[in-house]
Amino acid sequence: MKLLIMGPPGAGKGTQAEKIVKEFGITHISTGDMFRAALKNQTPLGLKAKEYMDKGELVPDEIVIAMVEERISAPDCAKGFLLDGFPRTIPQAEALDKKLAEMGITLDGVINIEVPREELIERLTGRRVCRQCGATYHVKFNPPKVEGVCDACGGELYQRSDDSLETVSNRLDVYEAQTAPLKDYYAKTGLLKNIDGTKSIEEVFASIKNALQK
């Protein structure tokens, strides 16, 4: 099973990715993890990517594609993989298709988790973190017993700058501009599986399994 998963920040993509790889016995390829491993192991591609990252620039698509190719070629991907965090743009998707074709690999499905913008904002801006122990809470879905106070250690709870309304709105804008067009791209291939991400974790996972069996 060779899959790709996409969805906006706050859609629960990471949680579902963990469940998918466990269920199907495939390897989770997160581009973030891939970059960290390449940098840690000082691979030639990792060092190339580091040059751009150190300058605060985006790593060029051809380097990312080469890293994805290297990762997919590893023995642990022989049974299948779940690609998470790439592609993010149409040019990246086209380059990935070309590379997969060269490798003789075809995707079995593209999972797209959909959640309305208002709910994503509520999910992301409601997160609170303990300054002392790092425990996480949510003002609506997982509130502390006493507002602003950590249940575990009594530390002060705060909102990270990443979770501010302005930052969250910007992240969603970038996703909608860059990555949302991929829905049309993959819909044309017949691979796209749109999943309602507003339900419970188990219900969303059941929908994914059902969609992949069709």
UniProtKB/Swiss-Prot annotation:
BP GO annotations: AMP salvage
InterPro entries to which the protein is assigned, alphabetical: Adenyl_kin_sub, Adenylat/UMP-CMP_kin, Adenylat_kinase_CS, Adenylate_kinase_lid-dom, P-loop_NTPase
Keyword list, A-Z: ATP-binding, Cytoplasm, Kinase, Metal-binding, Nucleotide biosynthesis, Nucleotide-binding, Transferase, Zinc
EC number(s) given by UniProt: 2.7.4.3
EC primary class: transferase
A matching Pfam family: ADK
Gene Ontology cellular component annotations, sorted alphabetically: cytoplasm
Catalytic reaction(s) noted: AMP + ATP = 2 ADP
One Gene Ontology molecular-function label: ATP binding
Region span, LID: 126-163
Cellular localisation: Cytoplasm
Ligand binding (ATP): G10, A11, G12, K13, G14, T15, R127, T136, Y137, K199
Keyword S-adenosyl-L-methionine: no
Region annotation NMP: where it falls in the sequence: 30-59
Record flagged with keyword ATP-binding: yes
Sequence positions that bind AMP: T31, R36, E57, L58, V59, G85, F86, P87, R88, Q92, R160, R171
Domain of life assignment: Bacteria
Binding site residues for Zn(2+): C130, C133, C150, C153
UniProt family annotation: Belongs to the adenylate kinase family.
Domain remarks in the Swiss-Prot or TrEMBL record: Consists of three domains, a large central CORE domain and two small peripheral domains, NMPbind and LID, which undergo movements during catalysis. The LID domain closes over the site of phosphoryl transfer upon ATP binding. Assembling and dissambling the active center during each catalytic cycle provides an effective means to prevent ATP hydrolysis. Some bacteria have evolved a zinc-coordinating structure that stabilizes the LID domain.
Quaternary structure and interacting proteins, as annotated: Monomer.
Function summary: Catalyzes the reversible transfer of the terminal phosphate group between ATP and AMP. Plays an important role in cellular energy homeostasis and in adenine nucleotide metabolism.
Protein name: Adenylate kinase
